[in-house]
Amino acid sequence: MPGGAAAIKKPNVLIILADDMGFSDIGCYGAEIDTPNLDRLAGNGLRLTQMHNTSKCFPSRAVLLTGLYPQQCGMDHGPGKFTSGIFFGEVLRRAGYRTLFVGKHHSTDNPYDWGFDHYRGMRDGAANYFNPGLQRSGEPRPAQKRYGKRVFAFDDTIVQPYTPPSDYYSTDTWTDWALELLEDGRASGQPFCLYVSYQAPHDPLQAHEHDIAKYAGRYEVGYEAIAAARYRRQQEMGLLDQRYPRSQPTHRPWDALSTEEQADQVRRMQVYAAMIDSMDQNIGRLIAKIEAMGELDNTLILFAADNGASAEVVRIGDGPIGAIDRWASLERDWANVANTPFRLFKNNSYEGGICTPFIAHWPAVIRGGGAIDHTAAHFIDIMPTLIDIAGAEYPATYRGEALPPLSGVSLLPLLRDNSIQRGNPLYFQWNAGGAV
């Protein structure tokens, strides 16, 4: 290097994405759900209260990967092929990073062909957590929307159907894959960029029984009591201004439900909570690995969700909610609670659909003490941030075609306790809804 200066060690990056999770669904955003690992990251990092996605799975993921609005990269109508853009995996690989992607992609393109050194995961939007493939011997037929049709990829190897071993549970297994990739690359000496895209807590509602059992007796109080307690904690934490009103609840009166309906709803929320709890446990495994590598202080960890909780109704199979042979969804009432204090849900361009918890943890840079910032931001800002911290360059062309300019701004000044300057307002659209 010029002047004989020592090389500056580049930071590692870990991006963790949850799926269909509400604003209030983790402890550090008001939930009664046990998420000690995310709470630890928040307590030693930065939380944003106005980080926005697109309200829908695949366009949010496209924005995160490319730094472009969905309309700019061809992902505004369906989870097909990208028509433009470059993935952050390619950009950071050119900057000397080992780029790794594990989990849900939700596009017909293979991330391995778009700049990630390794990809292991599901290219589809949702699948059975215990078995996304064909029925295994001695087990019930797995509840699925399209039996045996889910596409998985392992680097350049496409597998359809993917029928895993009987100990498979996607949240656990995908974390196993991520840990293997981290270990395999240690000898390279390269900084890593690892993107772990969980499908939790997207339906089907499925979890280990020991995790579900932790939430016995917690949700019998009903929708309103849980939502009100979450709202109170949000205010006490400083996430919400004391003057910020809670949106008008849209859930049914709990007492209007029959005993059978209440039991059904309690079970749904117990399983949903267990799925988030399980995800947090696995995030703890990732943190522990990075800590054991001696890299935690020099690793930027980002956590968010692709959209708010979903009010969609899916009912497949006859098994108990939570089991391999039942595909159940959270549905409207609990989704309203999950999105506290906001209104509406996934697929809606209201805060309940587009506002996500967002945690940034980077001890070498971010102020400690669990800071909270109310600056408006969007997934379009992630790519510029990664480019900034990695000393990377956004190319003018890719695969022989000109690239659209990035739509967002770097959040690095915000991580350093400064403000960001945005030249254009945030404006985005999904389906019939838009937001500015």
Which positions does each model-derived feature cover?
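Formylglycine-dependent sulfatase
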Residues: 1-436
